[in-house]
Amino acid sequence: MAKLTKRMKAIKAGVDSTKQYEINEAITVLKQFTSTKFVESVDVAVNLGIDARKSDQNVRGATVLPHGTGRSVRVAVFTQGANVDSAKAAGADLVGMEDLAEQIKKGEMNFDVVIASPDAMRVVGQLGQILGPRGLMPNPKVGTVTPNVAEAVKNAKSGQIRYRNDKNGIIHTTIGKANFSAEQLKENLQALLAALTKAKPATAKGIFIRKVSVSTTQGAGVAVDQSSL
């Protein structure tokens, strides 16, 4: 059995795993145990009342957090014509078609998000085996296949997160950095939960958002009392 680090022992001692914390208290607890070596991300796990085995109950989408994620995001765009200048003006880091596809085939993937206009999918479709496993394949459900590439680039740059439930019906994503204020993290979490509630499948029955837990990159999860949100 792996030996617990001094930090993990402190976290286990300081976090009551049976308690649901008021959101501001939960964030205070997280900040007590953050690393001094780097600024950790604040992540969230949301347990949904869905049957993930049923395709019509899976939840997938994207939303822009009001205070962003604290991360610098590099965006690659597949498009042509007038959209090229629009994408560049919006802040895209890489813009192209076949030339960009060739870079990716060579393993040159210095980007975090891929966006494509519909007329570029004939090129992007050839990259499915490369982009798919990395979670980078453009998809209209999360707004990364769109005729308005400029807006998609701006969203990605301004803190858009993409979410998708895992096989256990849990959404895992980030809501900011440990150096964000409690209010910023709370408002980001509220924005995510509002987006998830809006995306509730029609076939999902009962309580939809069942449990919300927040954690830092290397910390333990802290359950959040939803009534405090």
Curated annotation (Swiss-Prot):
SUPFAM superfamilies: Ribosomal protein L1 (SSF56808). Keywords: Repressor, Ribonucleoprotein, Ribosomal protein, RNA-binding, rRNA-binding, Translation regulation, tRNA-binding. InterPro entries: Ribosom_uL1_bac-type, Ribosomal_uL1, Ribosomal_uL1-like, Ribosomal_uL1/biogenesis, Ribosomal_uL1_3-a/b-sand, Ribosomal_uL1_CS. One of its GO terms (molecular function) is tRNA binding. GO terms for cellular component: cytosolic large ribosomal subunit. NCBIfam families: rplA_bact (TIGR01169). Binds directly to 23S rRNA. The L1 stalk is quite mobile in the ribosome, and is involved in E site tRNA release. Protein L1 is also a translational repressor protein, it controls the translation of the L11 operon by binding to its mRNA. This is Large ribosomal subunit protein uL1. The lineage of its organism: Bacteria, Pseudomonadati, Pseudomonadota, Gammaproteobacteria, Pasteurellales.
